Regions:
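Glycan-recognition and catalytic cores of secretory/periplasmic carbohydrate-active enzymes
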Residues: 1-167
């Protein structure tokens, strides 16, 4: 087998795993069709272990679904799952100061904020990728806004609590 065939073989293996294993698992077991978004704590058999939702995972899931839609196959269910997570993020995951929560309940009630901007970065790439998938410029603008907010949070002294206290 030459290098090109070898790489093609692995690409097909990964695509097959994504489309026949990974995406169906999360769509069937993690997608919260009642409240929106995705449950983030599943056992290997798909059973729900905890109903709290990681906010950064909402952004990652929305991005993954839109990216797969844009680059693997035009699977409408993937686009719908991306939109579900994006709507959940928009409705429940931003605090009044623009900083995102780290964790919320299944219904979107805030549980915890962190000093990091992981939630913002994943939300920004999710909005951007969803905009590419749909052509809706609102989400491109939203991606840029969230990105600029994250930059501001990181560059504004005292906005994010220090990770350590100086001695």
């Amino acid at each position: 087998m030459n290098k090109k065939e070898y790489l093609r073989s692995w690409a097909e293996t990964y695509k097959n795993d994504l489309t026949n294993n990974i995406m169906p698992f999360w769509l069937n077991h993690g997608w919260d069709k009642e409240n929106g978004g995705i449950y983030t704590c599943l056992d290997r058999d798909g059973s729900l272990m905890d109903t709290t939702k990681s906010v950064w995972f909402q952004g990652r899931w929305a991005f993954i679904c839109a990216f797969a839609y844009n680059n693997v196959e035009k699977n409408q269910e993937w686009l719908e799952a991306s939109k579900s997570a994006i709507d959940f993020i928009e409705k429940y995951c931003f605090d009044k100061d623009g900083h995102m929560y780290f964790e919320v309940t299944a219904e979107g009630k805030p549980l915890r904020k962190r000093r990091y901007v992981f939630s913002e970065t994943f939300a920004a790439i999710a909005f951007a990728e969803y905009s590419l998938a749909t052509g809706d410029k609102h989400y491109a603008e939203r991606a840029l806004q969230v990105f600029h907010d994250a930059q501001r949070f990181l560059s504004t002294p005292g906005f994010l609590p220090a990770k350590y206290e100086p001695t």
